[in-house]
Regions:
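Dual-mode signal for accessory low-complexity, basic/Gly-rich regions
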Residues: 112, 213, 269-448
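Active-site bordering "gate/hinge" segments
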Residues: 1-294, 298-301, 310-313, 398-400, ...
Length: 448
C-alpha cells in the first residue's frame, strides 16, 4: 500500500499528463484499500478473506464537455492510454453549462486540518478470529439463544488522494475496525433474530467482544413471543439505532441536486422552521476518530463544522459545484466522489443534538404507543415526504416499554414528523449518523 504522499504524487502525475494532452481542466482521485475479514459460526472458523486493491479515476474537461474514466492498472502506458481515451470521450460528450471544477478561490489553500483517523495497525487474522469467537460465544451464552448466524471481525486501511488542475492536491489515510454478532432465539415458527455491532477508526476503541455478543443475544431473546395490539394513530418512539435513518431522509431532501431538480419535500423550506426549535443537526467533519472525518471534500474544498438545522431552522442546502452553479449559489464543502462519475454530495459525522428530558420522561405520558428498534423496506417518497415502513420493536403501555411487536407498519409524512420530533438526552456517538431517542406523535401504526 502506498503512503499518502506517494498516492498524492500519483494523482498529480495523472493531472499533469491530462493537461499536456490538451485537457482544459481535470481532476483525479486515487483510492487504495486493504482489508481482512474473519467470520466464525458455531465456534468454528467459517471464512477468512484478505482483499487489496487500488484504482484511479480521471475526469477531464474540454470546454463545457467532460468525461470520466478509471483504471485499476497503474502501468504507465495504461494510464497514458487512459488520458487519451478520456479526452476522446469528452470531445463527443454533450455540453453541460454547469459542469466544471470547484471555484479556485474556494479551494483549500492551507495545511489540511489534522484528522486523527488512522492508527497504523494491521492486526493479525488470529486477533480478529479471537474477537469474533468471543463475540459469538457471549451471544450464544445468553439464555434463550438457540442458534447462531455467526460472529465477524474486520480490519482495514484506505488511502485517498485528490488532485485538480487548478491548484489543489491532498491525501489522507484512514483505518477501520468492526466487530459483530448475530444470533437466533426460540424454536420453530417462533424464532427471532437480532444482532449487535461496533465500528471504529482505532482498534483500541472497539467495544469489548463480550459486550457486543451479550447485546446481540439479549436483543434476540427480547423479541420472542410478539403480541398483537390495536392499530391507529399513536406516539412512535425511535431507538437511536434506527432513529438515525431519519437523518438520511433529511440529508437527501436538502441536497443541491434534489433542490435543482425540484424533487425534494423540503424544496421551499430554506430559512424556515423544519424541526422543533429545541433541535439542531450538526455536521462535524473534524471529529477526532470520527467514522467519516475528513479535511477536504471531493472537489478540494475545506470541510467545516456546519449547523444544518439551527434551533429547528434549515440554514442551507448541501451542494457540490455543479448543483451550486445551477442554483446560483456557492458549493458548501460537501462534495463526495469515487473514481467514476461526477461528484455528488454527502455529509460526514452527522448528529442531532440532545433534548432536555431523559428517555424515561420522554415516554412516561404515553398511554398506548410503540418503541421501534427495527425498520424494514424503504417506503419513502422523497418528493412528497410520505413515509411508510415495516417495523418491529416493543409496545409502550402507560409509560412503560412492554412486550415485543413485529411485522407492523408505521406511516406518516416526514414534514409532520420532523416538526413533532422530541429528543431525549441520551445521544451517543456510535455511528456516522447519531441521534438520541426520538419521539413523534404524528404517525399511524398498523399492527401485525
Amino acid at each position: 500500500m502506498l503512503k499518502p504522499s506517494e498516492a498524492q504524487d500519483r494523482a498529480d502525475a495523472l493531472i499533469s499528463q491530462a493537461k499536456k494532452a490538451g485537457a482544459d481542466a481535470a481532476d483525479a482521485i486515487y483510492v487504495c484499500d486493504a482489508a481482512t475479514q474473519v467470520q466464525m459460526r458455531l465456534g468454528n472458523l467459517e471464512d477468512v478473506e484478505r482483499s487489496e486493491g487500488e484504482e484511479i479515476g480521471l475526469r477531464v474537461f474540454v470546454g463545457k464537455r467532460s468525461a470520466t474514466v478509471s483504471s485499476s492498472d497503474m502501468d504507465p502506458q495504461t494510464l497514458s492510454d487512459l488520458v487519451g481515451r478520456a479526452l476522446d470521450m469528452a470531445k463527443e460528450a454533450p455540453e453541460d453549462q454547469y459542469a466544471g471544477l470547484a471555484p479556485e478561490e474556494l479551494l483549500l489553500k492551507t495545511e489540511p486540518h489534522a484528522i486523527e483517523g488512522d492508527d497504523g495497525q494491521d492486526p493479525d487474522p488470529e486477533i480478529l478470529r479471537e474477537l469474533a469467537l468471543k463475540a459469538e460465544d457471549a451471544a450464544r451464552a445468553v439464555k434463550g439463544v438457540t442458534n447462531s448466524e455467526g460472529g465477524g471481525a474486520s480490519a482495514g486501511r484506505s488511502i485517498v488522494a485528490l488532485a485538480t488542475s487548478h491548484g489543489f492536491s491532498g491525501a489522507y489515510s484512514t483505518s477501520g475496525y468492526s466487530l459483530s454478532a448475530s444470533v437466533i432465539a426460540g424454536e420453530g415458527d417462533g424464532m427471532e433474530r437480532d444482532y449487535a455491532y461496533d465500528s471504529v477508526r482505532f482498534l483500541e476503541d472497539l467495544d469489548a467482544a463480550e459486550e457486543i455478543g451479550k447485546e446481540a443475544g439479549e436483543r434476540a431473546v427480547s423479541r420472542l413471543n410478539p403480541v398483537s395490539f390495536k392499530s391507529g394513530a399513536m406516539p412512535v418512539v425511535y431507538d437511536p439505532r434506527v432513529g438515525n435513518s431519519l437523518l438520511g431522509h433529511f440529508i437527501g431532501a436538502i441536497s443541491g441536486s434534489a433542490i435543482a431538480r425540484k424533487t425534494s419535500f423540503l424544496l421551499d423550506a430554506l430559512d424556515s422552521q423544519v424541526f422543533d426549535s429545541s433541535l439542531s443537526i450538526i455536521d462535524c467533519p473534524h471529529r477526532k476518530r470520527g467514522l467519516r472525518s475528513k479535511a477536504f471534500d471531493g472537489e478540494g474544498l475545506p470541510t467545516a463544522k456546519t449547523k444544518l438545522i439551527d434551533n429547528g431552522r434549515l440554514t442551507q442546502w448541501i451542494m457540490e459545484s455543479a448543483s451550486a452553479r445551477q442554483l446560483g449559489l456557492q458549493p458548501t464543502g460537501h462534495a463526495s466522489r469515487g473514481v467514476g462519475g461526477a461528484p455528488g454530495v454527502s455529509v460526514t459525522n452527522l448528529h442531532m443534538g440532545n433534548g432536555s428530558v431523559s428517555k424515561a420522561d420522554l415516554i412516561k405520558d404515553i398511554k398506548h404507543g410503540v418503541y421501534i428498534t427495527e425498520l424494514i423496506g424503504m417506503g419513502v417518497n422523497p418528493v412528497t415526504g410520505d413515509y411508510s415502513r415495516g417495523a418491529g420493536g416493543f409496545l409502550i403501555t402507560d409509560g412503560e416499554i412492554g412486550p415485543p411487536i413485529s411485522e407492523i407498519t408505521i406511516a406518516g409524512n416526514l414534514k409532520d414528523m420532523f416538526k413533532s420530533l422530541i429528543a431525549a438526552d441520551d445521544l451517543e456517538y456510535r455511528y456516522a449518523g447519531n441521534v438520541p431517542t426520538l419521539r413523534t406523535d404524528s404517525m399511524t401504526v398498523a399492527g401485525g
